[in-house]
Amino acid sequence: MKIVFSMRAWGQYLHWQNEPETLARVNGLIQECTRTPFTGTGKPEPLRGDLKGWWSRRITLQDRLVYRVTGTAPDQSLEIAQCRFHYDR
């Protein structure tokens, strides 16, 4: 599965380079999303409203990984919209 970051999500991902424990958590969640996008750690939950079709997983108490899976196998992509803060539109 291909992993695609939005520009904002990539900047947020780079922020975690200074916090190794959180970076390891983010990397683990991303890897898990590629295998089992809708179950697993981080309390995966579908989002509603303007973010319908996207899912979130908890990174820390205040930070979320927001993502969606697009395409069909073998051409699926994991699109990451954000990996810091709470849900932004």
Question: What is each of the regions a protein language model found here?
Answer:
Residues L23-I30:
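PIN-domain endoribonuclease scaffold, especially VapC-family toxins
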